[in-house]
């Protein structure tokens, strides 16, 4: 501690003041009587007070006189460029080292490090951080930029290496801004998990109190973080999960790939971290199975792969009568749309619909050259469209439907395809086809997006054969009342049973019965007991898959499967 010489001055009113010991070379003596400027008399008493020395935290950022930022360290950090370190003496006599972060010119052509995407943001922001290979590769890119770039710049270069604390465990090398964050990270190496869940039969342990608090909410069901969007009612266990969700509304992608020429951006740093490994070639997760040794860029892909060896399939379809199991959640999600007949994602360029955003994004990239289309961007766009559609639906009245009935007659001796009625409901001129059993029980509704209009072909699938009923597609041909006949065509092209179509109000002409076909199809599984299930055909979907899906749906009982305009 440092001593300062002060003198106390007792004023005439009894109050005490402190006077610095030396005033312009003069010395005030103990007990001396002095007269102050306001005319009052004071007595001098000398005392000693202690001034606490100012201590710096290791790695603390400080602002220098020239306005630049530096970092204080008690000892030189391993791996730092000696030319970027400056030894200084603190007031308490100790020596510290100031680290001046390296600046990268913004016009660099090897590696562009944006202001909000410095290398320090790339290292271990979440549970999984970058491995040492990735960090080294990025630093090599940055150092090459410094070596090849001119020394002079406009002073607005981006700081690299702000993370002052590097993990010393072999093969790790992850970087952190504070000693506390490094200490928390090191628990992943030591296995220290002192925060344990108290719920019965759980006993999970965590490295941080925040991790435990978030986990406990899986037991309590608490979701305190609610989406602020007016039309969205979702809530989340953690603020981080809420922040990621909000970006689906705003379209924000704050985490950009730092590699020049890539330009991709992501909603979370973890997704970006995995993406960067496609540039560096790092695959930190290796399959331990003998004779396998496959490497993966993410822990999720690694875990899914390991289940191939173990045979574990933890994700089960909950649809009654199905019970299929999958090794990964994404496969279960994709499987579920088979039961819902849902293709909610529509291409804005050509109108094709898809079940997954990943398939739509791949279609946009290959068919329309939209290289920036990704699974996340299409999901965000879809959710925004859903919100707009919900808002518009509240303002517009429901249209009144009109009906056109189609009756198909099949020979009684043919038990494979029982008699059925297909009814077309026109709402605002848009036809909607419903398949109805002989006893009048409606089984499924098919939207205009599923059929593309009346011109779509309906495949009637049985356990023994597949036939196609062609319905004319041009609405101007629905002109006069009457009865007309079209022909059902088998899979090999052979004409089979004639089908009579009875229309009311609007008609189909006989000579155009096979005039128009559209690329989309709906498969109808017909059984001897009169049960009908319609299944939307996907590209390259096999007949076996169609029968499997429809059979599973029929096991649920005779229920009405209503669909929206996009089949959901």
UniProtKB/Swiss-Prot annotation:
The answer, when asked if Phosphoprotein is one of the entry's keywords, is no
Zinc fingers, C2H2-type, are found at: 165-189, 195-219, 225-249, 255-279, 285-309, 315-339, 345-368
Please give the residue ranges the record annotates as the region 3 X 12 AA approximate repeats: 34-99
Instruction: Note the segments forming the sequence repeats.
Output: 34-45, 62-73, 88-99
Q: State the coiled-coil residue ranges.
A: none
Stored Gene3D superfamilies:
Classic Zinc Finger
Indicate where this protein is primarily found: nucleus
Entry keyword set: DNA-binding, Isopeptide bond, Metal-binding, Nucleus, Repeat, Transcription, Transcription regulation, Ubl conjugation, Zinc, Zinc-finger
Region described as Disordered: 365-401
Q: Is DNA-binding one of the keywords?
A: yes
Gene Ontology CC: one annotated term: nucleus
Compositional bias of kind Low complexity = 379-396
Instruction: Specify the domain of life of the species encoding this protein.
Output: Eukaryota
- Give the matching SUPFAM superfamilies: beta-beta-alpha zinc fingers
Q: Name one GO molecular function term.
A: RNA polymerase II cis-regulatory region sequence-specific DNA binding
Q: Where in the cell is it found?
A: Nucleus
Example of a GO biological process term? regulation of transcription by RNA polymerase II
Q: Where is this cross-link: Glycyl lysine isopeptide (Lys-Gly) (interchain with G-Cter in SUMO2)?
A: 24
- Which family is this sequence assigned to? Belongs to the krueppel C2H2-type zinc-finger protein family.
Functional description taken from the UniProt entry: May be involved in transcriptional regulation.
Name the record gives this protein:
Zinc finger protein 76
- What species is given as this protein's source? Rattus norvegicus
Q: What is the lineage of its organism?
A: Eukaryota, Metazoa, Chordata, Craniata, Vertebrata
UniProt gene name: Znf76
